Regions:
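Acidic, metal/ion-coordinating pockets
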Residues: 1-127
């Protein structure tokens, strides 16, 4: 289970990142959550920008692809994360709204970016 890497305390299952072996090479997947998320307090979540940056610095040299999943409510936060990690992460994907934004693009330093990739789940549901 990959859960937000910036949860500072509590006994939560999983970890905040994983390195997966694929036919294309090693992929580092990082999950971080914006501080405004209503399920956690500011005292519980560390700065997602700095946490993602730290993991990339520690693990990024050992992988072929770096993908960051940023769970946030506001599109402005997701855009900020994309620009913050541009050139350091290969892919930045926003998640939360359940509806894809259909705005894939390549940022100036080469990072692939989508504001929100939508939901993976039940199609016959209210969420």
């Amino acid at each position: 289970i990959i859960r937000p890497a910036n949860i500072m305390d509590g006994d939560y299952p999983g970890k905040g990142y994983e390195i997966l072996e694929t036919d294309a090479g090693k992929v580092l997947i990082i999950n971080v959550m914006a501080i405004e998320n209503h399920h956690f307090s500011k005292e519980t979540l560390d700065n997602p920008y700095l946490v993602a940056e730290r993991i990339i610095e520690e693990e990024g040299k050992n992988v072929d692809v770096i993908l960051v999943d940023f769970h946030a409510e506001y599109t402005s936060d997701k855009h900020a994360m994309g620009f913050y990690l541009d050139g350091r992460a290969d892919v930045v994907l926003g998640t939360h709204t359940h509806v894809p934004t259909s705005d894939p693009r390549v940022l100036p330093e080469g990072t692939l970016y989508v504001t929100d990739v939508g939901m993976c789940g039940n199609t016959d549901s209210v969420l």
